[in-house]
Every structure is written in C-alpha cells, then in structure tokens.
C-alpha cells in the first residue's frame, strides 16, 4: 500500500473531551438554578459569553473558566456569592486535571496505522493544555509530529500542508468535527475520514460539505483499519 500522510484530530477522536465539559455544565446549571432562569436561557447566556471569549482568548479550559465565571455574574446579579464563584473555580480545576479517557480501539488502531503511514497529530486548543493531554494520553509515540494550533481555519490547514510537504491526494484528515476537521480539510484539497462522536460539542457541528478531496465516513476509530 502507498504510504499516506494521516493528520489525526485529538479531542473526541482519540479521547473523550466534550463529555467532561458537559458534566461540568450540568453542575454549573444546577448552581444557577435557584435564580429562577430556564436552563435554555442560562445556556444561551453561557454560549454568548463563550463565543466572545473564544474570539478574544481562544479555546481551552481557561477560556471556559472565564466564561463560566462571567456567566455566573450575569445570571446572579446582586445575589452573587463568593462561595459560588469558588465552586465554579473548583469545577474547572477538576476538569483541567481530568486525565484523557482514550476511546476504545484507539491505541491498537494507531499502532496499526503508524506502521504503514506517516502520522501527524493535529489538534486545536491552548498550547500547554493540549500538550499536557497528549503526554498524559500516552499516545504521542504513535506520531511522527505533533501540531497544536489555536484554530483550524483553511489558512492553518494550508500552512500545515506546506510545512510537512503533504501531497494532497495522499493526505487524509481524520476527525470527529465537520466544522473544524472535515470541511476545511476537503476545501484545501485533502481527503477526509469522518469519525462521528455522539457527544461532539455543538459548536463543532455543521453540514458536511463537498471539496476537492475524497470523503470517507466510518462508525468508529477502529474501523479505519479497513481503509488504511
């Protein structure tokens, strides 16, 4: 088989990510419930706050923490309590120190793929935070290179292609996000393998779009062995 270049996303592709954020959100919504707002409204306030913070501060737990604290203050108003703010900080600290839960079939599939192809881990987020997750996952040895970026735009994809001299027809992006993995990869001319995750972050969802590259959809990461 021809040796390909596989760009592999991390969060919700190699290990669980969003499920831990959702668990923290459930605790947060319970915290603000006494203020009488509908949960949908509280989530709307949080989503808007988070959107603004992502634009200013990027992705990651620290940006998420800022959004939770600011949303709490907006919802609590004059009823805000220092103990509640400390509880939010405690939630975030617990989230930050939660070790990656590697998804079923990932280690053996990476071992198989890395014996046949060039492997690049390609993930977005806060640099130190993502690097720590990669190290704690124990998966770094399967990759020839690790790329951590603040966002996954078409420009960033093209820069990665140029940096690693990827022949587009022989390059594949493997990921769980249509918005940040699959669509921009296809639009830059790469091929893409979509591995959907049941609990992908809502901001990651989008309609799959066509592009110059091929699109493959597999039901699990383990299923990649049937195609590569």
What are these regions (language model features)?
Residues 123-125:
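Conserved phosphate-coupling serine/threonine residues in phosphotransfer and NTP-handling enzymes
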Residues 47-94:
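A metal-dependent, Asp-based hydrolase signature
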Residues 1-45:
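Active-site neighborhood of HAD-like aspartate-dependent phosphohydrolases
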């Amino acid at each position: 088989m021809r040796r390909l270049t596989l760009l592999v996303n991390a969060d919700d592709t190699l290990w669980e990510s969003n499920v831990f954020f959702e668990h923290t959100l459930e605790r947060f919504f319970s915290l603000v419930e006494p203020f009488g707002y509908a949960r949908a409204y509280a989530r709307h306030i949080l989503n808007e706050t988070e959107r603004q913070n992502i634009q200013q501060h990027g992705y990651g737990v620290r940006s998420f923490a800022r959004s939770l604290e600011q949303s709490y203050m907006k919802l609590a108003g004059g009823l805000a309590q220092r103990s509640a703010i400390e509880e939010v900080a405690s939630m975030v600290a617990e989230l930050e120190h939660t070790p990656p839960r590697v998804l079923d079939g990932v280690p053996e599939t990476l071992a198989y793929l890395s014996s046949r192809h060039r492997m690049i881990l390609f993930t977005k987020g806060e640099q130190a935070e993502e690097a720590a997750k990669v190290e704690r996952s124990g998966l770094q040895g399967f990759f020839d290179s690790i790329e951590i970026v603040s966002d996954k735009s078409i420009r960033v994809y093209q820069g990665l292609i140029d940096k690693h001299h990827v022949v587009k027809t022989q390059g594949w992006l493997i990921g769980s996000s249509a918005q940040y993995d699959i669509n921009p990869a296809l639009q830059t001319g790469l091929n893409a393998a979509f591995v959907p995750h049941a609990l992908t972050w809502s901001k990651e969802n989008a309609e799959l779009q066509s592009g110059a590259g091929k699109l493959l959809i597999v039901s699990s990461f383990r299923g990649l062995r049937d195609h590569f």
